[in-house]
């Protein structure tokens, strides 16, 4: 029996955060046995905002090495760099022709990014969700892990796929209609200084962010200064509405130790101050990341291995993608290359 197909990508722009790890990358490793996983480093998406070429080059290799370091197995999953599989851009162009301007102009992320990068609001940024749709539809993905910021894009991918199928292949649909993958455990990590906002790797205030490769001393320092509250006496309780800072730290501690919120609350019942709890959270996060960081350094220094992973991944991905692209080209009436 074939496994459900999953597609997910990671951007090689900026340092990946612990939020990227807990919310996506660790999940990637856990899904490999039960799903047919397609994982890509989405460098085509990265250039929708201006990138330094050398920095993008290095960040792409960094992201690939991180995927491997967290446990993505190239023998179980298809791991590749997006620009190495030209079918993504080819299908993206076709899908552009079946996407309405009004649909794209309603995308919340475009509004947010165009405000942030007001000096470079390019067509690629506007059409970003269409390329994302191509990423998904090329592989017949049944499920797509998405955060709240990408949910609208997945809905658009579903609309584009349905529209194309209805025009060209209502009886035998070319595109699979993807569903969101909902993780059993919510691993949403919030900003350290303002726990009402999601942690973002691109946050200008670096005190808000813990990066995946961050120095242990820096991690502990940031957590020691993280937002708590002024409740007297101090109370460790998972209450997102009234104790957002403590709830965020509890989430990190739970992710790092495997303890439930109830167990954490019992462990710290009757505390006189938040300092000892913060100390334990910092040490637990460092212990969680240390093996990943060590494995990353080993893999990142083995360029021959990275090259082999990229080469094999691109070949596997392209073979799958080409099957879909041929069906699409035939459906719209393109003449096949002799």
From Swiss-Prot:
Keyword terms, alphabetized: Aminoacyl-tRNA synthetase, ATP-binding, Cytoplasm, Ligase, Nucleotide-binding, Protein biosynthesis
BP GO terms, sorted: tryptophanyl-tRNA aminoacylation
Motif ('KMSKS' region): 198-202
Predominant localisation class: cytoplasm
Protein name as catalogued: Tryptophan--tRNA ligase
Residues that, per the record, bind L-tryptophan: 135
Annotated CDD domains: TrpRS_core
Underlying gene: trpS
Function: Catalyzes the attachment of tryptophan to tRNA(Trp).
Annotated motif 'HIGH' region, positions: 12-20
Catalytically driven reaction(s): tRNA(Trp) + L-tryptophan + ATP = L-tryptophyl-tRNA(Trp) + AMP + diphosphate + H(+)
EC number(s) from the headed UniProt entry: 6.1.1.2
PANTHER family: TRYPTOPHAN--TRNA LIGASE, MITOCHONDRIAL
Organism, scientific name: Vibrio cholerae serotype O1 (strain ATCC 39315 / El Tor Inaba N16961)
GO cellular component, one term: cytosol
Pfam families: tRNA-synt_1b
Source taxon at top rank: Bacteria
Binding residues annotated for ATP, in chain numbering: 11-13, 19-20, 147-149, 189, 198-202
């Amino acid at each position: 029996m074939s496994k459900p197909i999953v597609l997910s990508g990671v951007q090689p722009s900026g340092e990946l955060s612990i939020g990227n790890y807990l919310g996506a990358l660790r999940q990637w490793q856990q899904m490999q046995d039960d799903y047919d996983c397609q994982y890509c480093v989405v460098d085509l998406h990265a250039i929708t905002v201006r990138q330094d070429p050398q920095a993008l080059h290095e960040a792409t290799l960094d992201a690939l090495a991180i995927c491997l370091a967290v446990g993505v197995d190239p023998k179980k999953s298809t791991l590749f760099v997006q620009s190495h599989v030209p079918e993504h851009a080819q299908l993206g162009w076709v899908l552009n022709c079946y996407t309405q301007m009004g649909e794209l102009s309603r995308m919340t992320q475009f509004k947010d990014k165009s405000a942030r990068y007001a000096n470079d609001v390019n067509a690629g940024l506007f059409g970003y969700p269409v390329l994302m749709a191509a990423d998904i539809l090329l592989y017949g993905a049944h499920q797509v892990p998405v955060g709240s910021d990408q949910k609208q894009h997945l809905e658009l991918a579903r609309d584009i796929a349905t529209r194309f199928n209805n025009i060209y292949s209502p009886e035998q649909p070319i595109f699979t209609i993807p569903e969101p993958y909902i993780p059993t455990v919510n691993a949403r990590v919030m900003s350290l200084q303002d726990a009402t906002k999601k942690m973002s790797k691109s946050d200008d205030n670096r005190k808000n962010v813990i990066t995946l490769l961050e120095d242990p001393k820096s991690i502990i320092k940031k957590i020691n200064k993280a937002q708590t509250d002024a409740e007297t006496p101090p109370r460790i309780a998972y209450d997102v509405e009234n104790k957002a800072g403590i709830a965020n730290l509890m989430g990190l501690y739970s992710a790092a130790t495997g303890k439930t919120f109830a167990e954490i609350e019992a462990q710290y019942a009757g505390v006189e101050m938040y300092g000892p709890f913060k100390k334990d959270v910092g040490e637990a996060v460092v212990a969680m990341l240390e093996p990943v960081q060590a494995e990353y350094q080993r893999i990142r220094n083995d360029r021959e291995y990275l090259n082999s992973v990229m080469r094999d991944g691109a070949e596997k991905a392209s073979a799958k993608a080409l099957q879909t692209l041929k069906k699409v080209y035939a459906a719209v009436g393109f003449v096949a290359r002799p």
